[in-house]
Regions:
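Condensing-enzyme catalytic core mediating Claisen C-C bond formation in acyl metabolism
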Residues: 23-76, 174-246, 261-262, 266-274
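Conserved beta-ketoacyl condensing-enzyme motif
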Residues: 41, 75-135, 242-257
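Short beta-strand segments
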Residues: 42, 106-107, 156-162
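Short, well-ordered, mixed-charge alpha-helical segments that flank or form enzyme active sites
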Residues: 112-114, 164-169, 213-218, 255
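Active-site-proximal alpha-helical scaffold in enzymes
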Residues: 131-158, 197, 231
Length: 274
């Protein structure tokens, strides 16, 4: 038995469950998938704004701008421009053309993913619009990796972006309003990143994908993003922390903590920094 589901502009084909081979051999535990054909990272690029240029991670950016509008007339258009720039840079570094990508998985923090959809429309690449807030980069990499592992794509791009001024208008107060920021307020990055995955390459490889779960601790302060994200640190063992936070962020935490008389050395997996 075969049936077809029409979902908006896309078409999803599904077959009777008896005709589909079991995927249980790919699952490890409750939320992790082991990829039998791990895709390789073949190119990546990123871009940041003025605050990022002044921050401790400035040397890790491929491109930095002191213009929060990136030559555009609105901040929303600026965010779209960032996405377009990073995808083109990643393509150029891999010596690829837009037509060489089978899919692009991208998202941002705006309604209807307008940062992604307007920024990437000229590429003409099959597009999955994602909304995972701060997890969008991980979500896009996960889905792109599974598309390639499943044999549905040879190359796919994972993209995300955020912009301080667009995020403030989306979630809190428009910047021109001049609202006073409370002590708990975080600063949303003005930045974008793109990673291109392929079914063949020198690595690094994405070998496993873990999907998180929704945790609601009742945090109602829209300014305090740190409190909303804190539960993940409680559940992680030290040896797994770097897989989520990243080596750069761990190194930065050590530097900042040491300067204030605190340390995470011995608490998290920091052997690579000794």
């Amino acid at each position: 038995m075969t049936f077809i589901i029409f979902l908006f502009a896309g078409t999803l084909w599904a077959t009777h469950k008896n005709e589909v081979s079991s995927m249980n051999e790919k699952r490890v535990g409750k939320r992790t998938i082991a990829l039998s054909h791990p895709p390789s990272v073949i190119s990546y690029a990123n871009i940041g704004g003025r605050q990022e240029a002044e921050g401790p991670l400035s040397s890790y950016f491929d491109e930095l701008s002191d213009d929060s509008f990136f030559g555009e007339k609105t901040w929303e258009k600026a965010e779209s421009t960032m996405q377009k720039k990073v995808v083109q840079r990643a393509l150029d570094q891999a010596k690829l053309k837009p037509g060489d990508l089978d899919y692009i998985c991208a998202g941002d923090l705006l309604n209807q993913c307008i940062g992604s959809s307007f920024g990437l429309r000229d590429f003409g690449i099959p597009f999955y619009g994602l909304y995972g807030a701060c997890s969008t980069m991980g979500e896009s990499l996960s889905l792109a990796a599974m598309l390639i592992d499943g044999g549905y794509a040879s190359r796919a791009a994972a993209v995300t972006s955020s912009h301080f001024c667009t995020a403030e208008r989306q979630y809190r107060m428009p910047v021109p309003y001049g609202n006073q920021r409370p002590p708990t307020a975080q600063w949303t990055a003005t930045a974008a990143g793109c990673t291109i995955l392929a079914d063949d390459g020198p690595g690094p490889y994405i070998t496993h994908v873990t999907c998180g779960k929704i945790v609601d601790r009742g945090v109602s302060d829209a300014n305090n993003m740190g409190a909303a994200m804190a539960p993940v640190s409680v559940k992680l063992t030290p040896s797994k922390y770097n897989a989520v936070c990243g080596l750069v962020s761990t190194h930065h935490s050590l530097q900042q903590g040491g300067a204030k008389g605190a340390t995470v050395m011995g608490t998290h997996n920091t052997n690579h920094l000794k």
